[in-house]
Amino acid sequence: MKPISFEISYETSGGPRRISAGLGAPFETQDLSVCPHVDGSRITCSIETKAELTVTGFSLELAHEFGAKDRVLVNGYQSWTDTVELPVRSRMRGVNDIPGPVLRKWVLDGSGDYRFADYDGKPGHLHGYTYAYVRTDGACELVGSLDESDGFTKLEVLADEGKVIVRPEVPLGRLAAHETHTLVQLVLVRGSLDECFEAWFTHSGITARTTRPIVGYTSWYRHYYDIDEAKLTADLEAARDAFAQVETGDALKVFQIDDGYCTVGDWLAVNPRKFPRGLAPLGASAREAGFTPGLWIAPFVCEKDSRLFKEHPDWLLRDDDGNPVKTGCHWSGGYALDTRNGAFRSYLAEVLQTITRDWSFKLLKIDFLYAACMLPHDGCNRGQLMHDALELVRSAVPSEVLLLGCGVPLGSAFGVVDYCRIGCDVGLDWDGKLYMRGLDRERVSTKRSLANTIGRSPLDGRAFANDPDVFFLRDDVKLSAAQRALLLETDCTHASMLMTSDDMRCWDEQARLFYQHAVHALLDRSGANTTRKA
């Protein structure tokens, strides 16, 4: 890829303007100076304003001669978005072909980029965020953003035109005269796939907070919302007994309570029928059994039936027409919260501190994080909102608390969360019903989750420790023995977490041996295998 030119559009008191030029010396107008800088593999472009103005768009054009054998990967919008190597002439489908009533009822445009990104469906027109690469016969060229905290970086592959267009989010609002603002920071690297990712993260200065693998149990794929103290106590006992027979080395053993303990948004109002003693006793029991207690929370959303929705309408994120912004069809309807609202920020900090300090949960699975950046507002673009929201969570919890991000634009999570989901939810079957396969790119699918585990594996141990979602060894799912084996083998060789929702008491000796083999493979990859016998 070769940097060729830039284009910037802006508005002054004299009206809208647009200029384009090659990436040579600084380019000046009466309104601003554009300062591109190419230093080896690094490209930066900044502006210096001479008058008050609003930047409305910026793009950088890279030239690339695509070949018929090229494979292209563009990183999807968030954790669940499909991200795999594709033939260069592939088409990228959005939700344009879904009938409007279906789209609206199930809010199928809520979790992706469909509300603000174009999907033209043309062969070779692909887009993603933060990074992309082209690979042919082992040789790789990667373009990666060095900083997403000031805005997301969209990457558009136009194979038929021999171009890659870089479109960073621009500042929201008016810039004063004599301001300097960096619009984009990129790195272009070549080599093997591993060499490219290593060079990119070296340039960025980002390092993973941990490389310690996790093994353990989560309640979701066994009980879904139908959890209570008795069920989870039985699950904990089963997990304790099962792990007593497994060599886990230095892996962290986690027992995680997932969704279903309260109405979403009312995090401290734990359902007294399900958990008459609250959640703290279960967390204490998990610690006594040798596990790190974990808890699921979706910090930036609430459901329509919550007290929060009814009592704090001013905390809801609203569109230009004043309507609450829907994030999906989950629960009684999911709605985004305004993460810039001071009262909400105080409430969330209190919730997180109660969970981690008073209830003593030491791992938080923070989910549906994309809700924080549904709409640019309060002077912040989407990338700035996501960065700010994650920093709010990180600063509210004790330093030793581990964060597992999910449903998050990945670039914002680099170096911030300890563990991160890198694919969609697995299902209890292989690829869902036939009619589901034409829906959004974030849909539940074991097949697509597994593909994402491979596609995003280079991030593991560099950006964070990768969470591939759970595996299944139980036989009451609609997965063949070969599919279950492939899922577990892929997880232990491409990621850093081996979590299950199986009733581990029902595993036979063959299943236990298969799991032990997978744990050994996981530990060997991470260097955490301190117990394996020679």
Residues covered by each model-derived region:
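Carbohydrate-recognition beta-sandwich/jelly-roll modules
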Residues: K2-A251
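Glycine-rich, histidine-containing beta strand-loop boundary motifs that form or position
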Residues: C45, T56-S59, L295-P299, D367-F368, ...
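Mature catalytic domains of secreted/periplasmic carbohydrate-active enzymes
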Residues: V166-V170, R174, D194, A199, ...
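Aromatic-lined carbohydrate-binding/catalytic grooves of carbohydrate-active enzymes
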Residues: Y217, Y221-Q353, R357-L375
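Glycan-recognition surfaces
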Residues: F309-S346, E350, E391-C506
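Non-catalytic C-terminal accessory modules of carbohydrate-active enzymes
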Residues: D502-A534
